[in-house]
Amino acid sequence: MGRGRWRTAGSALVRVLLVWAVSTLTMLVLAGILPDFRLQSDDGDSITQIGLTAVWAAGAFGLLSALVWPLVVRALLLVPALVLGLLVFFLNGSLLLIALGLIPDGRSEAAPETAVVVAAVMSAVASATSTALAVRDDEAYRRRLYRLADRRRRRQGGAAGTPRGAEAPPGLLLLQLDGVGYEVLRHACADALMPTVAGWLEHGHRARPWRTDWSSQTGASQLGILHGSNFDVPAFRWYEKHTGEVMVCNRPTSAAELQRRAIERTGHGGLLTLDGASRGNLFSGGADQLALVLSVSARRGRANRSRAGYFAYFSDPANAVRTAVSFVAEVVREVWQSVRARIRGDRPRVSRGGLYPLIRAFATVVERDVVVAAVIGDMLAGRSAIYADLVAYDEVAHHSGPRGRDTDRVLERLDRSIALIARVAEHAPRRYRIVLLSDHGQSPGETFLGRYGLTLKDLVRAGCGLPVSRRAGRTRSGAEARAAVLAALHRPVEEDEEAHPGRGSEPVVLASGNLGLISFPGIPGRASRARIERAHPALLTTLANHPGVGFLLVDGVVLGRDGAVARLDVPGEAEALLAPFGPGAAEAVRRTDAFPHVADVMVNSAYDPRTGAVHAFEEQIGSHGGLGGDQGRPFLMWPTELSDPDPGLHPDPGLHQGLDPASDPDPDPRQVQELVGAEAVHAVLRRWLREADGPQVPVAPPMGGAAAEPAGRPVEEPPPGGGNSGSFPSAGVPARDEIR
């Protein structure tokens, strides 16, 4: 054992010396290239003296980075993440200036702006060298990973996990590719955009679509997947009359309240309650290990900082610099892609200026890097269940469209992240079964504003006889709505100003993708159709007959074009009216109609089954949130050692690339049994956890290592026996193992 430790220490010393040598050479090269950076005195020095100065400066910079950087990042935890990323260059440059100041006799100096460049290059080169050495020395890398796992077991005092020498049951890693629909996944694999995922589908994985609820967006889907209930989540944002507040799924206070309601309704903490980790999600899933989780982001406790995930990542200066460089590159890429789309005259197109390039870079670079690093740390720690959300595709697809060159590049980078995670999984202290899934897809289409020249809010206000902007009033839709109001009120056109109701009756109009919500604060409770028509005689007719509107839901009644009406409580009526929106549309609408906080009027945009296009009520040319098209068909992809999501479905084992027959254009209806709703996905994931002898879902946090079952609830069935486990393919390079 002593000899092994000496060998390990010797290898570590050699790696440090090699990184130091490469950093020294890099500094010498930069001193020769950059005019404002020198490593010699004003009188000149010998080559030997210049070399010694570079050795001193490189060593001082490396030591300062290792000692000071974690403290600086911890002090900046409360700084907004975007600002923290931009400060990386300044902080690294400052450390270099300090290092140069430590050299005796003033033999080195650099202009501040040059110091930033030198520090960035040196950090990137040092990081690349360290990674290359780790790749070459597989044994040292593997020993380091197992040491990290042993440290975790020692910290837990052996109470948790598997005893030394015993094989741990396999863990479950759930990676959510936000917004990637089933058809997008199929094409990405067929077009070699995602070779890692395609390889899994050919050897050991299978994929199938599942159907979302009417509210096809992350808030509803992820709440259902992680907590088992998305009841009373009618949209991404909605108005609650009893409080007078607008709930927004990506607002921290709203997310915390939605999570509280789901826990209260289900009676358990969530999917990840025992030894789980939640990374980059809206909700915690009951996990103790959290990073970038919105529902707890308002907490400021020492043990659960809102941006603890950033500290775990940015405490390594090389990671910080690498991410900062990628951040800047992504901003430049977005600006160029936006200009290119404008020059080519691409249609449809939305504005991509303002802060959007920074927002996109944060989602596609910073959040991706932090989440991937956190997942790697979770695997090295051997956690039983991990759920992480990678949001890059969804963010880009909103502004570039679900299909195209921009999103193709994002899918390629997502595949590289998956490959990196799979490579690290091979060195984890336990095997991991990797499941990929998405929360929704995206449907393309020109925005409602771009197609008709006015927003849904403009149309509603015009239909209520309220003032609208001159631009909206001059559109055909606005003029028709205004005329309908006057006709309904039996007033001549010149008397339209008398038709304006008081301000207290103005509706609240909200948009969630191609789903619109209209609430009347002045009407207590849920407004009936008759009550709305008395207050605003032309509104419902104006909306239902608009070419950009597919249908309305008003108090148990579905309204379509040309006076079509279907009652939800009459069998078959809604199914016939909503048939163009796909199977299950009527049932999804019927479920939402039962929500306490459903809006007075729910508006789903028009949908073209031939093109799959919808009209978002927001400025998005790739949208989701309602019914129509690929937005309602996300995917679930699992290793075949796990049971089928639906035991009644037996896919053809010879089907190409492991894709499910549910995707066939003309499937056998006796064979296809689709998963419906996020709550059904939650049930499948719970079953897979049980199959791995993994965590159960308790009513409350476990006491004394055991979780009690709630009274009156059935005891979990024992896990099914058997099942051989396969390994996952290797790809990419190992991650820096210092990230925990």
Regions flagged by a language model, labelled:
Residues 182-319, 468-521, 526-528, 694:
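Active-site nucleophile/metal-coordination loop of metallo-enzymes that catalyze phosphate/sulfate
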Residues 250, 255-256, 261-268, 275, ...:
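Active-site neighborhoods of enzymes that stabilize oxyanions during catalysis
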Residues 365-366, 370, 378, 386, ...:
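A long, amphipathic alpha-helix that forms part
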Residues 135-140, 230-384, 389-401, 517, ...:
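His/Asp/Glu-rich, glycine-adjacent segments
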Residues 142-205, 450-451:
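Active-site-proximal N-terminal segment of extracellular/periplasmic enzymes that hydrolyze or transfer
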Residues 1-114, 128-133, 137:
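Juxtamembrane/disordered regions of integral membrane proteins
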Residues 643-671, 700-736:
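Intrinsically disordered, low-complexity terminal tails and inter-domain linkers enriched
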Residues 415-453, 557-559, 564-566:
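Metal-dependent active-site segment of extracytoplasmic phospho-/sulfohydrolases and closely related
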